[in-house]
Amino acid sequence: MTNDDVLDEFRAAGALREGHFVLSSGLHSPVFLQKNLVFMRPERCERLCKALAQKIIATVGQVDVAVSPAVGGIIPGYETARHLNVPSIYVEREGGGFKFRRGFHLEPGQKVVMVEDIVTTGLSSRECIQAIKDAGGDVVAAACIVDRSGGKADVGVPLIALASLEVPAYPADALPPELAAIPIEDPGSRRLKG
């Protein structure tokens, strides 16, 4: 599956949006990938995650388990794990970091691929990878459907992206005038309070 094929899936779902968005990272961007509109269609999610699983196997070989960060990584993590024929587990935010809960655990030395939906700065990925390492897992790679950083995000392990985009993202105090003139939408989930 090519970059264009992946973006076509997002376009077909109405999930490639343009405007002025505050991302979960707190950065501002003229482009937002509304992944939930992609993942809500099982056949679309299956195509993307099957291709990601194939890319994982071609890059690092077989793994023992796929671990994802809740909430956004659960669906692509599960579907990718299904195509890898390995268990899918996830970590949840607790006390400022990610933790294994709900009976999930790793056996020491298990080969783990960390599966994300979208990577922008790599912060959530790094936090998830740290939780995996703390639990004794051997993180052989991280994988995502889309790397918005164009390969610049450092997650601390090799990053396998089904598609890579170089989408600009700016801190609030460094917005270009044309972006600052557009009303802000805040579709990110990190700042939601439950």
From Swiss-Prot:
- Give the pathway annotation: Pyrimidine metabolism; UMP biosynthesis via de novo pathway; UMP from orotate: step 1/2
What catalytic reaction does the record list?
orotidine 5'-phosphate + diphosphate = orotate + 5-phospho-alpha-D-ribose 1-diphosphate
**Its Enzyme Commission number?**
2.4.2.10
Q: Does the keyword rRNA processing apply?
A: no
TM region(s), chain numbering = none
Pfam families this protein is in?
A: Pribosyltran (PF00156)
Instruction: Give residues annotated as binding orotate.
Output: T120, R148
Keywords carried by this UniProt record: Glycosyltransferase, Magnesium, Pyrimidine biosynthesis, Transferase
**Superkingdom, according to UniProt?**
Bacteria
Cofactor requirements of the protein = Mg(2+)
* Any one Gene Ontology BP term: 'de novo' UMP biosynthetic process
Binding of 5-phospho-alpha-D-ribose 1-diphosphate occurs at E116, D117, I118, V119, T120, T121, G122, L123, S124
Query: Record's InterPro entries?
Result: OPRT, Orotate_PRibTrfase_bac, PRibTrfase_dom, PRTase-like
Q: What does this protein do?
A: Catalyzes the transfer of a ribosyl phosphate group from 5-phosphoribose 1-diphosphate to orotate, leading to the formation of orotidine monophosphate (OMP).
Q: Hey, which family's this protein in? A: Belongs to the purine/pyrimidine phosphoribosyltransferase family. PyrE subfamily.
Q: Assembly and interactions?
A: Homodimer.
Name of the protein: Orotate phosphoribosyltransferase
In the UniProt record, the gene name given for this protein reads: pyrE
